């Protein structure tokens, strides 16, 4: 089953890509918990992390610090949370492994249940800012 992530990876759907290498992609979340909320995903469409070879899990997670640092620099966030859900009972919405990087800000409390829908222009501006922070 082709997911929205597979369509973005294949260039069939637009995505706000902040990082890409041969095997991975990081994109801004279209429905962020807070500004800069991003997703790091393997290009191979594994549904759950338990399906991935250990070395690919290690490669995926090894990208998180560099991507998180760029997000923090670009957004002014002071901290971040990492989340990775497996299965719909764990609230995995898209059946393609992805790691959430959720920036946290000193001056506001972020609610995990309340998401804001930014415009494409806002996402594009933020994408450029993060990409320039690598």
Language-model regions, residue ranges each:
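HIT superfamily nucleotide-processing domains
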Residues: 1-134
């Amino acid at each position: 089953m082709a997911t929205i992530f597979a369509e973005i990876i294949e260039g069939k759907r637009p995505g706000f890509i902040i990082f890409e290498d041969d095997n991975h992609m990081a994109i801004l979340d279209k429905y962020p918990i807070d500004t800069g909320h991003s997703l790091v995903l393997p290009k191979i469409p594994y549904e759950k992390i338990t399906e991935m070879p250990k070395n690919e899990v290690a490669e995926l997670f090894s990208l998180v610090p560099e991507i998180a640092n760029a997000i923090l620099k670009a957004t002014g966030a002071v901290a971040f949370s990492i989340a990775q859900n497996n299965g719909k009972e764990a609230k995995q919405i898209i059946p393609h492994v992805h790691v959430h990087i959720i920036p946290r800000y000193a001056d506001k409390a972020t609610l995990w249940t309340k998401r804001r829908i930014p415009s494409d222009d806002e996402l594009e501006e933020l994408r450029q800012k993060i990409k320039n922070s690598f």
